């Protein structure tokens, strides 16, 4: 199980890196304009990842502290609050905040031991979902990049 956890952590790290690399390829004029499905700017996408990484970090520390109840999230409301709360940030500030939140998630996931994984399957569930989420938005951004005209 430990090997699978390490693989999952590596998968998330790779997905996070690909996301940031893809962000760098986007025309800077689009950082704060609506770009993805006409809904969110790149800054907004970054902001929502910041909050999900922070939430995962908090959940991991709670899981490690002992039994906790499941929480059901309304993803649309959660995302809307995350984006609204960060409208005052520039794109560069949002990236800095994401890097900080992701570092916290890396630290929390590194603290998870084999016995923790055996006791609570939510660690794997969260990390897998985050990896997939980064990949999903990376693919969206790559479509935007392919449509850019320089």
Which residues are covered by each model-predicted region?
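Alpha-helical bundle segments that constitute or directly flank the non-heme di-iron/ferroxidase center
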Residues: 1-29, 51-62, 132
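Short, helix-capping/interhelical loops that line the mouth of catalytic, cofactor-
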Residues: 1-7, 55-100, 104, 145-150
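Hydrophobic packing residues in well-ordered alpha-helices of helical domains and bundles
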Residues: 5-12, 16, 91-98, 123, ...
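Short, flexible active-site loop motifs that bind/organize anionic cofactors or intermediates
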Residues: 21, 35, 84
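Short, contiguous alpha-helical
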Residues: 32-77, 114-150
